[in-house]
């Protein structure tokens, strides 16, 4: 009941903060994993811009943490009850959101973004090819290790934020497959899973440094893990010997990239994901033909290319 009340409050607050349109303007809520994360704020900014451009009411909804699975389910149920034109959602957990999305799709068109769920009911799905994102992470890590040590050889580790998240599982899959296929000299000595908190990533990274004196590289597969891993590298002064590739960006990780604490960032286009999610949902609500899958892309940004125009655009998106 408590989570339901919280979810209801979030729905109400988001609805009140949405821009005013004509009474007959369609409403398309967007439900993200975590409204406090910079990444998701960029997604919401894209959705907000689409709402203004297309004349759509876009309530911005989501729990306060990616681990609040029940909270997101309650928010989805409340959104469906409001009888919107469509709903855009990034599921927090692959298995747990499957049935709720199946049920929601019986009443309204569901557009998925970023992470999938155990459901075939999505009308369309927009995401980074996260398997490819993992491969890009492996390639970036191998290049950084080779630049430092002369060869892409040595011990490496993987840090994943939360278990059972479709996008993160796909990144891990791509990372491991790329290591096996292209970099036999890189040995995965640790495959760690956290609880979605940067402090946990900090502790995991610190423990890896202590337990693995020959560690040469780490792939931290989302923003929060990159924050924590980068902090541990900075505190232990290991940037020269341990190369870390993160995933996604914010002010903290961009600073880490600029000063060499992080060797690179695999960066998505979350603004496009939010914008095109609303655009696709509106088209679907009108019965227009839409793509069932859209790859929104990912790019490796390093210190060497971070000042290029496209890199600047991705690293410094406008969220207001």
Region locations from a protein language model:
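N-terminal signal peptide c-region/cleavage motif recognized by signal peptidases
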Residues: 17-19
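A residue-level marker of the well-folded mature domains of exported/periplasmic proteins
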Residues: 3-5, 21-320
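Bacterial N-terminal signal peptides
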Residues: 7-15
